[in-house]
A protein has these predicted regions:
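NAD(P)H dinucleotide-binding glycine-rich loop of Rossmann-like/cofactor-binding domains
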Residues: 67-74, 79, 109-190
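Conserved acidic E/D residue at the C-terminus of a beta-strand in Rossmann-like folds
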Residues: 215, 283, 308
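C-terminal substrate-binding/catalytic core of Rossmann-like NAD(P)-dependent dehydrogenases/reductases
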Residues: 241-246, 286-334, 342-343, 349-354
Length: 362
């Protein structure tokens, strides 16, 4: 059976040639559909903090004297995207033209040790959408999903304001799950950006004893309260350590989830957390972070846990967005056409108070 569906030969695409050279191409070649591939017409793509840090030249992406470059230019950025199936290879089964779908950011190999034991999000050789030229991302009119892509179907009536948040909310869910929250825990979430808000609305479903949110922007803290925070504090306006210790008989919080990528937030977490507490880190850092490891080991014997991507999270996120359990209203603050990508990247920095900025396609 031949390839089903058709697409034009060229498309609009934002292409990263280097950290200082991002260009909107108006006639970039569309992806070719192999026998195991699915091509979607992109509806929208969110701009992530990782996209910003990549464009700003963070060493973890472009390398430095210590580490090699990880990205593979020229590539099309964007991993928070979804779209409608417009073309499918002859071997593809279980999907139909016109269905709305999205996929995990990681493209696992399916063969390595981690993939075989079910930890596909930690795939050793893995590819990632939006950073490599053989897995181009969603800031283009068309995107190719390969055979090992982890695809999830979206309801036809799911609005952009929810569909564009499935990927970041999947990451939020995984981070909260790593914390293993119980109803006896005092939980602190540092950061009320998109990821932090996703963590707050999901953590509320865990019914912790108290859910405390920290952020330097008061408008984000107001939204955090609407999403389920019991208490909010601005570290720039109060002594967070004093406030949290006062609420916990001087012990500190049971769980601290770091969602800012700011070194000061890491140090803050090690201060406000109690002995034998659980510290979860989910952030991309733009620079090195130094902490006193004696706090982690000798003084507090902390349980330090990382959180990476959004494994097995999409079905839950999609269902609970649609039924209203996961709040999304107010997270997407700006929707712009791809032609205004420079404005979008600028606003995504939060300088005008924006949260999630999304690029939309016709």
């Amino acid at each position: 059976m031949p390839v089903r569906g058709s697409i034009p030969k060229t498309m609009k695409a934002l292409v990263a040639y280097s950290k200082d050279d991002y260009r909107l191409e108006l006639a970039y070649p569309t992806p070719e559909c192999g026998p195991d591939d699915i091509i979607i017409k992109t509806e929208a793509c969110g701009i992530c903090a990782g996209d910003l840090k990549c464009k700003h030249g963070a060493a973890m992406f472009w390398g430095d004297d210590i580490q090699p470059s990880w990205v593979k230019p020229p590539f099309i950025p964007g991993h928070e995207f979804y779209g409608t199936i417009v073309q499918m290879g002859e071997n593809v089964e279980g999907y139909e033209l016109g269905e709305k779908i999205t996929a995990d950011q990681i493209v696992p190999c399916g063969k390595c040790r981690f993939c075989k034991d079910g930890h596909y999000w930690m795939c050793q050789p893995h590819d990632m959408y939006g950073f490599m030229n053989y897995t181009n991302g969603g800031m283009a009119e068309y995107v190719r999903y390969g055979k090992t892509s982890v695809i999830s179907k979206l309801p036809k009536d799911m609005p952009l304001e929810q569909a564009a948040l499935v990927e970041p909310y999947g990451c939020s869910k995984h981070a909260v799950d790593r914390a293993e929250i119980t109803n006896e825990d005092v939980v602190v979430i540092s950061g009320a950006g998109t990821l932090g808000l996703g963590m707050i609305t999901y953590a509320r479903m865990k019914n912790p004893k108290k859910l405390i949110v920290l952020d330097m922007q008061d408008n984000r803290l107001e939204l955090a309260k609407k999403f389920g925070a019991d208490l909010v504090f601005n570290p720039g306006k109060c002594d967070v350590d004093k406030e949290i210790k006062a609420l916990t008989d001087g012990y500190g919080c049971d769980i601290y989830i770091e969602a800012t990528g700011n070194p000061a937030s890491v140090v803050q977490g090690l201060t406000v957390i109690r002995k034998l507490g659980t510290f979860v880190e989910f952030s991309v850092f733009g620079k090195e972070t130094t902490v006193d490891w004696s706090i982690i080991g000798d003084r507090k014997e902390l349980d330090i846990r990382g959180a990476h991507l959004s494994p097995y999270a999409y079905p839950f996120v999609i269902e609970n967005m649609m039924n209203g359990n996961l709040k999304t209203e107010g997270v997407i603050t700006r929707i712009l056409p791809i032609e205004e990508w420079e404005k979008g990247f600028d606003l995504a920095s939060g300088r005008e108070g924006d949260l999630k900025v999304v690029l939309k396609f016709d």
